[in-house]
C-alpha cells in the first residue's frame, strides 16, 4: 500500500494513538490523531480495519527500508548506519508493531510469513558482513538479526516511554550493536 503524504502522517498519528490509548474508541483515536470521526471512518471504517491497515503499512515500510539500505551491495558498516536511520525514521510504526507483538507474530508457518522476507534480508546482510570480516563469526547471522530487531524496537519503545532521548538514538544503537556495553576506555 502506497500512501500519499497526508495519509502517511495520519497513519503515523494513528499508530501512536492506538498504542497510547489501546482501548480508545474510533472517535477518541480520531481526536488523538487530529482528525474528525467521519474522516477516520472514511479512512478505515472500523477499528479492526485500522489495525490491519497499520500492520499492512508496517510490512510495506519494513520492505522499503530493506530496499533503501541496499543491504546486498553497500559496505556493511555504512549499510548498518542506514538501516538504523531508516528504522528510526519510522519509529511510530515500529512502536505499533511492538505493541501488536504476540508470541506467534513471527511464526513462518502462520501469519508471521508476511515478515519472513524482512527477516531473511537482515539474516543475509549480517551473514555478508560476517563473510567480509566486519561482524564477528561466533554469533550466527540469525542471532544478529534478533539482536538488531530487539535493540531498535526496544529503543523506540524507550523513547515513547520517556526513558531515552530520540536525538541520540542512532548513535547509541550503532555503538551498542558494534561494541556492546563494555567501557571503551578499558579496551
Swiss-Prot record:
One BP term from GO: regulation of DNA-templated transcription
Alphabetized GO MF terms: DNA-binding transcription factor activity; DNA-binding transcription repressor activity; transcription cis-regulatory region binding
DNA-binding region per Swiss-Prot/TrEMBL record: 26-45
Function field: Confers resistance to guinolones. May negatively regulate the expression of genes that are associated with cell permeability to drugs.
Record carries keyword RNA-binding: no
GO cellular component, one term: protein-DNA complex
UniProt gene name: nfxB
PROSITE patterns (UniProt xref): HTH_LACI_1
Protein name: HTH-type transcriptional regulator NfxB
Keyword terms: DNA-binding, Repressor, Transcription, Transcription regulation
Amino acid at each position: 500500500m502506497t500512501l500519499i503524504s497526508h495519509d502517511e502522517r495520519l497513519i503515523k498519528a494513528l499508530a501512536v494513538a492506538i498504542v497510547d490509548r489501546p482501548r480508545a474508541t474510533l472517535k477518541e483515536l480520531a481526536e488523538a490523531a487530529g482528525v474528525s470521526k467521519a474522516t477516520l471512518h472514511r479512512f478505515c471504517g472500523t477499528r479492526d480495519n485500522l489495525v490491519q491497515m497499520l500492520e499492512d503499512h508496517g510490512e510495506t515500510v519494513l520492505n522499503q527500508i530493506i530496499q533503501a539500505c541496499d543491504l546486498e551491495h553497500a559496505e556493511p558498516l555504512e549499510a548498518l548506519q542506514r538501516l538504523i536511520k531508516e528504522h528510526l525514521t519510522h519509529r511510530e510504526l515500529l512502536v505499533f508493531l511492538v505493541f501488536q507483538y504476540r508470541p506467534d507474530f513471527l511464526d513462518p508457518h502462520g501469519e508471521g510469513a508476511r515478515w519472513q522476507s524482512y527477516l531473511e534480508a537482515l539474516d543475509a546482510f549480517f551473514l555478508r558482513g560476517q563473510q567480509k570480516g566486519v561482524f564477528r563469526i561466533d554469533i550466527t547471522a540469525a542471532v544478529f538479526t534478533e539482536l538488531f530487531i530487539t535493540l531498535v524496537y526496544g529503543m523506540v519503545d524507550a523513547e515513547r516511554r520517556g526513558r531515552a532521548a530520540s536525538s541520540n538514538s542512532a548513535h547509541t544503537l550503532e555503538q551498542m550493536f558494534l561494541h556492546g556495553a563494555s567501557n571503551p576506555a578499558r579496551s
